[in-house]
Amino acid sequence: MPSLELTTNVAIPDERAFVLEFSKFAAKVLSKPEQYISISVKHNPNLTFAGTFEPALLLAIVSLDNIDPEKNVNYSKELFGFFKEKLGVPDNRGYINFNDPGRSYLGYQSTTFTEIFGK
């Protein structure tokens, strides 16, 4: 069920194509089926990082059962590599926030994931 919300000050020429490519990449990196991946991209030209408007980003990831300190290191490496290649944002110009709220705190299909998959 990963949802990824990207905010960047980089203008993306074809946002829809980027979102679809990002969705496939995120599914691979997070080892989750793409059918459960949700991507949101927001362009904010006023986003600053380290006091400048140079290319920057903020990424919030909410995902169940696969967020942990060891995996987050690899996720960070892979995702920042993707953003460097696709958006020109270096790895020192953004933050990635990893969050696993727990199955009871995420709703889907009129219930929660605890009810769907158990504890």
Report residues per predicted region.
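Interaction-mediating elements
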Residues: 1-119
